[in-house]
Amino acid sequence: MKQTVYIASPESQQIHVWNLNHEGALTLTQVVDVPGQVQPMVVSPDKRYLYVGVRPEFRVLAYRIAPDDGALTFAAESALPGSPTHISTDHLGQFVFVGSYNAGNVSVTRLEDGLPVGVVDVVEGLDGCHSANISPDNRTLWVPALKQDRICLFTVSDDGHLVAQDPAEVTTVEGAGPRHMVFHPNEQYAYCVNELNSSVDVWELKDPHGNIECVQTLDMMPENFSDTRWAADIHITPDGRHLYACDRTASLITVFSVSEDGSVLSKEGFQPTETQPRGFNVDHSGKYLIAAGQKSHHISVYEIVGEQGLLHEKGRYAVGQGPMWVVVNAH
C-alpha cells in the first residue's frame, strides 16, 4: 500500500504533497500553488480526486490524483454559497457537502463523474456550522452548529436535497460548541469534539428505542489546565481502538483508548505537538498520526505505539504558511 499525505497551507496558498513510507518517513513530491486560501480537503471515495475549499472567492476545486504517486492536476471548480470551513462527500461519490462557519449554512454540490457541477441545496440558520459528516450507512448527515450547541440531522435524498429527520437535532451541554466528528468502524457510535469546552461526546447512533443518545462526555484537558479551551480536530484509528483530539491553546493531542464495542473512551495521555494544531489525521494503516501546526508552519509525524495508543515522534517537516488541514490517501 502506497500512501500520500496532503497538507493545505492557506497563508501561502499551497498544497504540499508527501509520500509516506512504511517506516513513517515523509518525502516531498509536489508543491501545488492554489488560486486562493486553501483550507478543507477530502479525497473522493474512489480515490481519483482531491476536493478542496478555497477563499476568498468561495469555491470547491477538484484535483485529479495520479494513481502511481498521488500527484495533483487541476480538473474542475464550482462556486459555493459561503466560505468553506469543512468539506466531505457521501460514500458513493455523488455529492460534496460543505459547512460554512461564517455563512451559517451547509451546502450540497452535485458530482458528475467525480467533478463538481453546481450546488443543489443549501440549508441556512446553522450558526457556526463547522462540519458535515455522513454516517457510515450513507443515510444521515450530521451537521454541528457550534454557536447553537446542536447537531442537526438530515437525510440526503437521491437528488441531493437535505431533509430534516425526526428528531431533527441532538443538543450538547450549553457552551460546548460541537465542531468535528468521526464514526466508529462498527457504525454504532459517533464521537464529536467540542471546541469551546474541549470535551469529547460519545453518541450512540441508535439505542433499542430508536433514539440517539449521548452516553459519555470526557474532558480532553489535563486537570491543572486553566487557560482558554480551544479544541479543533478529532480522528480515530481504522481498527477503532484509539481516538485522538487536539487543543490549539495547549498545543496538545489527547490520546484516548476505545472500548471494544465503541461505547466508552478512556483518557490515556497527552502528546505535546506543533504550535496551534488546527488539523491532523491518522494514516490508513493505523500506525502513524500526522499533525500540522498553524503557527509553527511545520508538521510532525508520530508512531502510534502500544495498547494505549501513545504517540512517539518520528519526524518533523517544514510545510507552507499556516497549515490547517491534513488528508491521507492510500493507493
Curated annotation (Swiss-Prot):
Keywords linked to the UniProt accession: Acetylation, Carbohydrate metabolism, Glucose metabolism, Hydrolase
Pathway field: Carbohydrate degradation; pentose phosphate pathway; D-ribulose 5-phosphate from D-glucose 6-phosphate (oxidative stage): step 2/3
Enzyme class, broadest EC rank: hydrolase
UniProt keyword annotation of Zinc-finger present: no
The reaction(s) this protein catalyses: 6-phospho-D-glucono-1,5-lactone + H2O = 6-phospho-D-gluconate + H(+)
GO biological process, one term: pentose-phosphate shunt, oxidative branch
EC number: 3.1.1.31
GO CC terms, sorted: cytosol
A GO molecular-function descriptor: 6-phosphogluconolactonase activity
Any Pfam family the entry gives: Lactonase
N6-acetyllysine modification, residue list: 287
Recorded family membership: Belongs to the cycloisomerase 2 family.
Cross-referenced PANTHER family: 6-PHOSPHOGLUCONOLACTONASE, 6-PHOSPHOGLUCONOLACTONASE-RELATED
HAMAP family reported for this sequence: 6P_gluconolactonase
Function: Catalyzes the hydrolysis of 6-phosphogluconolactone to 6-phosphogluconate.
Protein name as catalogued: 6-phosphogluconolactonase
Organism from which the protein derives: Escherichia coli O1:K1 / APEC
Gene: pgl
